Amino acid sequence: MTHQTHAYHMVNPSPWPLTGALSALLMTSGLIMWFHFNSTTLLMLGLTTNMLTMYQWWRDVVRESTFQGHHTPNVQKGLRYGMILFIISEVLFFTGFFWAFYHSSLAPTPELGGCWPPTGIHPLNPLEVPLLNTSVLLASGVSITWAHHSLMEGNRNHMLQALFITIALGVYFTLLQASEYYEAPFTISDGVYGSTFFVATGFHGLHVIIGSTFLIVCFFRQLKFHFTSSHHFGFEAAAWYWHFVDVVWLFLYVSIYWWGS
């Protein structure tokens, strides 16, 4: 790899995809163990493995891009295509949850009382915490765009300020969502309403946590002067992902919270 005469990055063998897959297996198995047997051992093991994998994989990517110069324009182009395909796959992932929701709500079965929300379910008021959550995420979309424009103009301080605001709003959203779950008058086991509500909003919440982590990494990288106005794909990918999370929430809010209530 040291003496390459082409613009492409031949990646060195890495253990992180394997440990990442192992952590995913441990986390999903751990969730089942937690739900059914109230044991969090596997889940904690999975989360720890996942955190270690993320740290070391990100460290390697930063080393390759910033310090070894492997991310040439051709490589960045490939990474952009990869990120676009990843976001498309995420769109299809959430399509499944919306499909389940509309399949259940547009033609409620007699078991549900022939109505939606099902008999006995008291839905959350869409004009309370969900509306606040919507405004928080929309504001974070504005601040991430401000950060991007500041980076393009070479204004480092404004970029850091805007990025910090975005991260703070992302954390605030997560805390609001957690409090809403804690106070919700129904649970994930309350029939198809509880299942579709908690799975769809829960996976969105997980994506907000992933996006916030991505932005925190970008924040620390910017503190170390890793980004320039012409070389910042790591931040660009995080911004694309954050906008995707924003748009998914708008669909969730309109479908599940507002129309579905």
Swiss-Prot record:
Pfam families in alphabetical order: COX3 (PF00510)
Residues passing through the membrane, by range: 16-34, 41-66, 73-105, 129-152, 156-183, 191-223, 233-256
Localization terms from the record: Mitochondrion inner membrane
Gene3D superfamilies according to UniProt: 1.10.287.70, Cytochrome c oxidase, subunit III, four-helix bundle (1.20.120.80)
Spans within the Mitochondrial intermembrane topological domain: 35-40, 106-128, 184-190, 257-261
GO molecular function, one term: cytochrome-c oxidase activity
Mutagenesis or variant effect for V91I: In subsp. Pelzelni
Reactions the enzyme catalyzes: 4 Fe(II)-[cytochrome c] + O2 + 8 H(+)(in) = 4 Fe(III)-[cytochrome c] + 2 H2O + 4 H(+)(out)
Gene Ontology process terms (BP): mitochondrial electron transport, cytochrome c to oxygen; respiratory chain complex IV assembly
Topological domains, Mitochondrial matrix: 1-15, 67-72, 153-155, 224-232
GO CC annotation terms, alphabetical: mitochondrial inner membrane; respiratory chain complex IV
SUPFAM superfamilies assigned: Cytochrome c oxidase subunit III-like
Enzyme class per UniProt: translocase
Swiss-Prot/TrEMBL keywords: Membrane, Mitochondrion, Mitochondrion inner membrane, Translocase, Transmembrane, Transmembrane helix
EC number assigned by the record: 7.1.1.9
Membrane topology according to the record: Multi-pass membrane protein
Protein family according to the UniProt entry: Belongs to the cytochrome c oxidase subunit 3 family.
Protein function: Component of the cytochrome c oxidase, the last enzyme in the mitochondrial electron transport chain which drives oxidative phosphorylation. The respiratory chain contains 3 multisubunit complexes succinate dehydrogenase (complex II, CII), ubiquinol-cytochrome c oxidoreductase (cytochrome b-c1 complex, complex III, CIII) and cytochrome c oxidase (complex IV, CIV), that cooperate to transfer electrons derived from NADH and succinate to molecular oxygen, creating an electrochemical gradient over the inner membrane that drives transmembrane transport and the ATP synthase.
Subunit structure: Component of the cytochrome c oxidase (complex IV, CIV), a multisubunit enzyme composed of 14 subunits. The complex is composed of a catalytic core of 3 subunits MT-CO1, MT-CO2 and MT-CO3, encoded in the mitochondrial DNA, and 11 supernumerary subunits COX4I, COX5A, COX5B, COX6A, COX6B, COX6C, COX7A, COX7B, COX7C, COX8 and NDUFA4, which are encoded in the nuclear genome.
Name of the molecule in the record: Cytochrome c oxidase subunit 3
The species this protein was found in: Gazella dorcas (Dorcas gazelle)
Gene (UniProt): MT-CO3
